[in-house]
Amino acid sequence: MQTLSTPVTGTDERSTPVSTSITRRKTRPVPVGDVIIGGGHPVVVQSMINEDTLDIEGSVAAIRRLHELGCEIVRVTVPSMAHAKALATIKEKLTATYQTVPLVADVHHNGMKIALEVAKHVDKVRINPGLYVFEKAKDDRTEFSQSEFENIGDKIRETLEPLVVSLRDQNKAMRIGVNHGSLAERMLFTYGDTPEGMVESALEFIRICQSLDFNNLVISMKASRVPVMLAAYRLMARRMDELGMDYPLHLGVTEAGDGEYGRIKSTAGIATLLADGIGDTLRVSLTESPEKEIPVCYSILQALGLRKTMVEYVACPSCGRTLFNLEEVLHQVRSATNHLTGLDIAVMGCIVNGPGEMADADYGYVGKQPGYISLYRGREEVKKVPETEGVEELINLIKSDGRWVDPE
């Protein structure tokens, strides 16, 4: 057995508690309607309706459904001038029949005129640098000369400037939304199909905006492969820090798919960055109805301690020591209390791990002997009750502390 020649003693470094909270990257606040992205504000939840924007009633209903579920900013697609003009009616009807909701217009292929029109009616315009000034790829091209590269850059500036000026003068916002799958041809030739190409694509547009004194910018670096997405966002954050830029980042894994894997894939990308302090707003993109995206967003934020909008349940995985049907009881406790906000409730199957593992919980439900459970308030055991009365008595305990509200 190896023996240390010098005993290890406490040092300042060792005795300093390690922080368990996330330190977020400092960003500027960007207003989108009455919602603020960045600037230390809570991470904002977004989604996008899948209705045709020409369907006025359907679009209004879809926006309202999302907003009522907690979607704070809603994006709509605008593929034509007719769609852009329809947004004026959508916004008007939404305000008249429901309330004002921050809206974002999604503009793509050669959308210069569309973007200028839609900027009158929405709070933010999303553009894709790879498609905003879109030129069909040439099959025989082998490279871009420096002059060709710069000439296209000049054309981009000329095309983008009217939109930037319009948004600046209205104090509205722009998202520079780079997609890994749609980088411009000249970026692909110069940087390859890489995170570096994605970052340089965004920086080109950012610099144009800065030169026109417009800084209400949000940046995204989306990709369908999580490792590419992570590398692109991390590089973007690092490059912005090096350049003294403090723009908020919009997180998302594009084309994540559906079901369990789609949720896991989105979480793997989004939560990893949020845990590093990167990210100010997010969208979970699922091949399902948009309404199903919202709970996933809030669950990610809850799990990381960035926003607390529901009950946090702590429950052991069950083992041979468990003194009651843990899965069934957890379901009963959740059903009775999941409308509450901001509580931590622990459901533990035995005394071995129970009190220790649930020490940070507001309330605990612990099996101590067959047929009985012990209820805790924090670390304090309050009472022992028959298992058949456990859920009811837990509710009574929460009520006695004035922390209960009746479900709507």
Curated annotation (Swiss-Prot):
GO biological-process terms attached to the record: isopentenyl diphosphate biosynthetic process, methylerythritol 4-phosphate pathway; terpenoid biosynthetic process
EC number per UniProt: 1.17.7.1
Pathway linked to the protein: Isoprenoid biosynthesis; isopentenyl diphosphate biosynthesis via DXP pathway; isopentenyl diphosphate from 1-deoxy-D-xylulose 5-phosphate: step 5/6
Keyword Iron-sulfur: yes
First-level EC class: oxidoreductase
Sorted UniProt keywords: 4Fe-4S, Iron, Iron-sulfur, Isoprene biosynthesis, Metal-binding, Oxidoreductase
Reaction equation(s) it catalyzes: (2E)-4-hydroxy-3-methylbut-2-enyl diphosphate + 2 oxidized [2Fe-2S]-[ferredoxin] + H2O = 2-C-methyl-D-erythritol 2,4-cyclic diphosphate + 2 reduced [2Fe-2S]-[ferredoxin] + H(+)
Region (Disordered): 1-25
InterPro entries (alphabetical): Dihydropteroate_synth-like_sf (IPR011005), IspG_bac (IPR016425), IspG_bac-typ (IPR004588), NO2/SO3_Rdtase_4Fe4S_sf (IPR045854)
CC cofactor: [4Fe-4S] cluster
Binding-site positions, [4Fe-4S] cluster: 316, 319, 350, 357
Gene Ontology molecular function: 4 iron, 4 sulfur cluster binding; 4-hydroxy-3-methylbut-2-en-1-yl diphosphate synthase activity (ferredoxin); iron ion binding
Cofactor remark from the record: Binds 1 [4Fe-4S] cluster.
SUPFAM superfamilies assigned: Nitrite and sulphite reductase 4Fe-4S domain-like (SSF56014)
Domain of life (superkingdom): Bacteria
Family assignment from sequence similarity: Belongs to the IspG family.
HAMAP family hit by this protein: IspG
Function (record text): Converts 2C-methyl-D-erythritol 2,4-cyclodiphosphate (ME-2,4cPP) into 1-hydroxy-2-methyl-2-(E)-butenyl 4-diphosphate.
Annotated PANTHER family: 4-HYDROXY-3-METHYLBUT-2-EN-1-YL DIPHOSPHATE SYNTHASE, 4-HYDROXY-3-METHYLBUT-2-EN-1-YL DIPHOSPHATE SYNTHASE (FERREDOXIN), CHLOROPLASTIC
Protein name: 4-hydroxy-3-methylbut-2-en-1-yl diphosphate synthase (ferredoxin)
Native source organism of the sequence: Acaryochloris marina (strain MBIC 11017)
